[in-house]
Amino acid sequence: MNNPAYSLTMRDRLAELAPYVGNTPLYPIKKLFPSQKVKLFAKVEWQQFGGSVKARPAYRILRKAVENGSLDGGKAILDATSGNTGIAYAIFCAVAGIPLTLCIPENASKERKHILRSLGAKLEFTSPFEGTDGAQERARELALNKPHLYHYTDQYSNDNNWLAHYHTTAPEIWEQTGGKITHFVAGLGTTGTFTGTGSRLIEYNSGIELIALQPESAMHGLEGWKHLETARTPAIFNASLPDRVELVDSSASYEIIRDAAKYEGLFLSPSAAANLLGAIKVAEKLDEGTVVTVFADNADKYGDVMQEIFSNN
């Protein structure tokens, strides 16, 4: 029998968090890209409850699951993650009292593992060599074998992933640029940020160019990103949406982390740095325009990587 009081309590608790998700600042990049006619901005996505860009889809996915009764009977949320979506899930689930199980590659940073455990998430570790594809396989196995215990949200094929960006990220960018955005640049992981934001932006102005970024090779070290030629393409990805796809060098992305800290006061994660590098390359080819990218998270969860990068300074 369903427990309406249990579901209503979760619904109310999640609803209280709505003002704290999204509405992130749009930061102007001026020292690393000084230009009078071409403006470069980035959405600083770690400045919201949930700690990263993944707060947006995680929040929408959870709210819809509660509203649809998918968690009735005390089912746990189950999903695969490289870390950021998992952390956002864990934060929201802790507030709402929702049990959470996450399948995550074993090579996820120790900071992410510590945060997830501290927030009460149960972790299922998968092969580091299979990345998030392996984590998805394990999540599917658990959902298939124990359907009475889990609601598998599957962020890689869940339309609420990209819809979160369609309804929040894109309108924020449009308003913050005064409708002047000419190019949107973002890396591909679950592809939700690119798909949702890009789809809405071209509804505002069909002339906006959408440039997708991906790493140059399968062994790239950009946590959360996918090399689509060698990885499973997320079901939510609209391959016809990008005007073009640009490749980003991982080593150069790591190098720009130092410059972003020194000249812009930004402590960027590797994937945020890769977005910055890709956006600069796009902006450098323009005579005029407004380029916007997304800084998914900062470097707080990448201690070992940052120590290696900054130890030579």
Predicted regions and their residues:
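PLP-dependent amino-acid enzyme catalytic core
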Residues: M1-N313
